[in-house]
Curated annotation (Swiss-Prot):
Main location: cytoplasm
Annotated InterPro entries: ARM-like, ARM-type_fold, Ataxin-10/CTR86_families, Ataxin-10_domain
Subunit-level organization: Homooligomer. Interacts with GNB2. Interacts with IQCB1. Interacts with OGT.
Coiled-coil segments on the chain, per record: none
Upper lineage: Eukaryota, Metazoa, Chordata, Craniata, Vertebrata
Alphabetical GO biological process terms: cell division; neuron projection development; regulation of cytokinesis
Protein name (Swiss-Prot/TrEMBL): Ataxin-10
Signal peptide: none
Native species: Macaca fascicularis (Crab-eating macaque)
Post-translational modification: Polyubiquitinated.
Keyword Cell cycle part of the UniProt annotation: yes
Pfam family membership, one: Atx10homo_assoc
Gene encoding the protein: ATXN10
C-alpha cells in the first residue's frame, strides 16, 4: 500500500501545495503574504521550503561567477531567486514571528552571500538587477524593528555588502543598501564604522548622486551628525565636494524648524570645535580666488561653507558662548576680512566691487557673500561680549567694517551685516561708541555712511554721542 500523501499546508484558510516546486507556487505565496492575517498564520515549515529553493537556485549563480559564459543560462534561476526573496520580504512585513523564524534558518547568511555573488557578476541585465533589489529589500524587512535580526544582518553584511552596494550604478540598489545600513546601525556599530570610513564616505557620495533618496540623508543627519567621533575621523578624508555636502546638511540641521535638543548640544559643541579649528587653519585658501592663476573653486567653496556653518552656529545661543572664546577665531576672521578688503581695493579680482553681472551659482556670487558672512560672524562673536568688542577695537576692526559698507553699495546684504556688527560692537560699550563718533568728527567716517548703517553723531557740549536711528536686524 502506498504511503499517504502529506496534506497540503494551510495558510489562513487557503490551500498551498506542500512541496513548493515551481515559480507559480512561489508567486502565490508572495501574493498571500501581502495580507497581515496570512503572514501571522503562516506555517513555519514554509520558510524552510523557500530557503531550499533559494539555495538550489543559487548554485547557478555560483557557476556563472566561476564561468562567465554561464550567465546566459541564469534566467530561470534568477526568476526563482527573485520570487524567493519577494516571498520572504513580504513575510517579514510587521511580523516579528516570521522574522525570527526566517532568521533562525540562517536565511540571512544565504541571502548576503548570494547578493555578494550578484555584485561579482558585474552583469547589468534587468533580471539580475531585480533579484539583487529584492534580496536587499528582504534584508531590510527582516531587520526592521528587530534587534536580533539587525545583529545578524550586521555580522554578515558589514563591511563587504555595503562597500559593494553603496556605490552601485543602480540607484535602487543604493537606496535599499542604505536602508539596511540605517536600520542596522546603532551606537556600538558606529564605532566599527569609524574603522571603515570608506563606507561612511560612500554614504555621502550616495547622497550627492541621489539627493532624492531618503535613506542616505537620514543616515547622515540622524546618525553621522550625532557621532562627533565619526565626523572628526571622517572629515579630513573627505574631498572638497564631500565636505560641502556634509556641511550643507549640518547647516540644515542647525537651521531646522526643530531646534537642537539637549542631547544635540554637546554633540554640536564638538562639531563646533572641528569647524572652528579647520576654518582657522585653512581659511586663507579663499585668497587663491584673487590670484591670476585659475582657482580651485571647490577648495574655496569648502572653506566658504565652513564660514557659513560658523555663522549659523553662532546664531544659536547654546553654541555661541563656546565659539566666542575659541582661540584665534575672532582674530583670524578680522585678519582675513582685512586682507580680502585690501586685495579687492588694490586690484580687480573676485573680491572687487566691480558690479558686473554674474551667472547664477558662479563662485563670484559666493565670494561676494563671503565678506558679508565674515562681518556677520564678527557681529555674532561680539554679541553681548565686551572682551570681543574690545578686541575688535584693538585690532582696528571697526574702521575696517565701516569701510566695507562704504564701498559696497551693490551688496545690500553686506550693508545689513555691517549694521548688525556695529550695533553689537557698540552695545553697552562707550569706548567703541566714542571711537565711531570721533571718526565722524575727524572725517574718517562721514555722516551719510553712519546714517546708512543706522547711526548719527550728536554733539552735546564737548561730548560726542553716537545715537541709533533704526532697529537692530535679526542675525
Amino acid at each position: 500500500m502506498a504511503a499517504p500523501r502529506p496534506p497540503p499546508a494551510r495558510l489562513s484558510g487557503i490551500m498551498v501545495p506542500a512541496p513548493i516546486q515551481d515559480l507559480e507556487a512561489l508567486r502565490a505565496l508572495t501574493a498571500l503574504f501581502k495580507e497581515q492575517r496570512n503572514r501571522e498564520t503562516a506555517p513555519r515549515t514554509i520558510f524552510q521550503r523557500v530557503l531550499d529553493i533559494l539555495k538550489k537556485s543559487s548554485h547557478a549563480v555560483e557557476l556563472a561567477c566561476r564561468d562567465p559564459s554561464q550567465v546566459e543560462n541564469l534566467a530561470s534561476s534568477l526568476q526563482l531567486i527573485t520570487e524567493c526573496f519577494r516571498c520572504l520580504r513580504n513575510a517579514c512585513i510587521e511580523c516579528s514571528v516570521n522574522q525570527n523564524s526566517i532568521r533562525n534558518l540562517d536565511t540571512i547568511g544565504v541571502a548576503v552571500d548570494l547578493i555578494l555573488l550578484f555584485r561579482e557578476l558585474r552583469v547589468e541585465q534587468e533580471a539580475l538587477l531585480t533579484a539583487f533589489r529584492c534580496g536587499l529589500q528582504f534584508l531590510g524587512n527582516i531587520a526592521s524593528r528587530n534587534e536580533d535580526s539587525q545583529s545578524i544582518v550586521w555580522v554578515h553584511a558589514f563591511p563587504e555588502l555595503f562597500l559593494s552596494c553603496l556605490n552601485h550604478p543602480d540607484k535602487k540598489i543604493v537606496a535599499y543598501s542604505s536602508m539596511i545600513l540605517f536600520t542596522s546601525l546603532n551606537h556600538e556599530r558606529m564605532k566599527e564604522l569609524e574603522e571603515n570610513l570608506n563606507i561612511a564616505i560612500d554614504v555621502i557620495d550616495a547622497y550627492q548622486k541621489h539627493p532624492e533618496s531618503e535613506w542616505p540623508v537620514l543616515i547622515i543627519t540622524d546618525l553621522f551628525l550625532k557621532s562627533p567621533e565619526l565626523v572628526q575621523a571622517m572629515f579630513p578624508k573627505l574631498n572638497n565636494q564631500e565636505r560641502v555636502t556634509l556641511l550643507d546638511l549640518m547647516i540644515a540641521k542647525i537651521t531646522s524648524d526643530e531646534p537642537l535638543t539637549t542631547d544635540d548640544i554637546p554633540v554640536f559643541l564638538r562639531h563646533a570645535e572641528l569647524i572652528a579649528s579647520t576654518f582657522v587653519d585653512q581659511c586663507k585658501t579663499v585668497l587663491k580666488l584673487a590670484s591670476e592663476e585659475p582657482p580651485d573653486d571647490e577648495e574655496a567653496l569648502a572653506t566658504i561653507r565652513l564660514l557659513d556653518v560658523l555663522c549659523e552656529m553662532t546664531a544659536n545661543t547654546e553654541l555661541l558662548g563656546y565659539l566666542q572664546v575659541f582661540p584665534g577665531l575672532l582674530e583670524r576672521v578680522i585678519d582675513l576680512l582685512r586682507v580680502i578688503h585690501v586685495t579687492g581695493k588694490e586690484t580687480t579680482n573676485i573680491f572687487s566691487n566691480c558690479g558686473c553681472v554674474r551667472a547664477e551659482g558662479d563662485i563670484s556670487n559666493v565670494a561676494e557673500g563671503f565678506k558679508s558672512h565674515l562681518i556677520r560672524l564678527i557681529g555674532n562673536l561680539c554679541y553681548k561680549n565686551k572682551d570681543n568688542q574690545d578686541k575688535v577695537n584693538e585690532l582696528d576692526g571697526i574702521p575696517l567694517i565701516l569701510d566695507n559698507c562704504n564701498i559696497s553699495d551693490s551688496n545690500p546684504f553686506l550693508t545689513q551685516w555691517v549694521i548688525y556688527a556695529i550695533r553689537n560692537l557698540t552695545e553697552d560699550n562707550s569706548q567703541n561708541q566714542d571711537l565711531i563718533a570721533k571718526m565722524e568728527e575727524q572725517g574718517l567716517a562721514d555722516a551719510s555712511l553712519l546714517k546708512k548703517v543706522g547711526f548719527e553723531v550728536e554733539k552735546k557740549g564737548e561730548k560726542l554721542i553716537l545715537k541709533s536711528t533704526r532697529d537692530t536686524p535679526k542675525p
